[in-house]
């Protein structure tokens, strides 16, 4: 699963996923991409299961890009522990995905196969999504 090699702080403040993305709202590398239509935190397990779902549909010639990374740790206190006495320990890693963020991209396979791969990956993610085709600017 994805997680950072090292971080500046073990327990960051919660980062909001409200609002629209800045700069990651277009298909940059592949031909098709999957775009979040609402924001959410996506944990590393969901990203990994979506990656596996895409890679099973790609074959040998297909190419995939993961455009999100779980940089932020989420903390949790143990069960049956009273309130107070500090913040809990880091439990898992999440990527902050805002509305309009391109999460995965694929290329080098037939169009129907790309749509099928991204649709299967989208069902693994805890956000509402849509497919986006690359726009060629001439």
UniProtKB/Swiss-Prot annotation:
Keywords: Ribonucleoprotein, Ribosomal protein, RNA-binding, rRNA-binding, tRNA-binding. CDD domains: Ribosomal_L16_L10e (cd01433). Part of the 50S ribosomal subunit. This is Large ribosomal subunit protein uL16. One of its GO terms (molecular function) is structural constituent of ribosome. The gene is rplP. HAMAP family: Ribosomal_uL16. PROSITE patterns: RIBOSOMAL_L16_1, RIBOSOMAL_L16_2. Belongs to the universal ribosomal protein uL16 family. InterPro entries: Ribosomal_uL16, Ribosomal_uL16_bact-type, Ribosomal_uL16_CS, Ribosomal_uL16_dom, Ribosomal_uL16_sf. GO terms for cellular component: cytosolic large ribosomal subunit. One of its GO terms (biological process) is translation. It comes from Mycoplasma genitalium (strain ATCC 33530 / DSM 19775 / NCTC 10195 / G37) (Mycoplasmoides genitalium). Pfam families: Ribosomal_L16. It comes from the Bacteria. Binds 23S rRNA and is also seen to make contacts with the A and possibly P site tRNAs.
């Amino acid at each position: 699963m994805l997680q950072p090699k090292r971080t500046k702080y073990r327990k960051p403040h919660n980062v909001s996923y409200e609002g629209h993305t800045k700069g990651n709202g277009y298909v940059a590398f592949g031909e098709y991409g999957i775009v979040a239509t609402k924001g959410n935190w996506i944990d590393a397990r969901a990203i990994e299961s979506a990656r596996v779902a895409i890679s099973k549909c790609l074959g040998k010639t297909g190419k995939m890009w993961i455009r999100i990374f779980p940089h932020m740790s989420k903390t949790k206190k143990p069960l049956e522990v009273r309130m107070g006495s500090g913040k809990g320990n880091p439990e898992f890693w999440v990527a902050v995905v805002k509305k309009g963020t391109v999460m995965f991209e694929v290329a080098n396979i037939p169009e129907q196969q790309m749509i099928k791969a991204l649709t299967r990956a989208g069902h693994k993610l805890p956000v509402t999504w849509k497919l986006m085709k690359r726009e060629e600017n001439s």
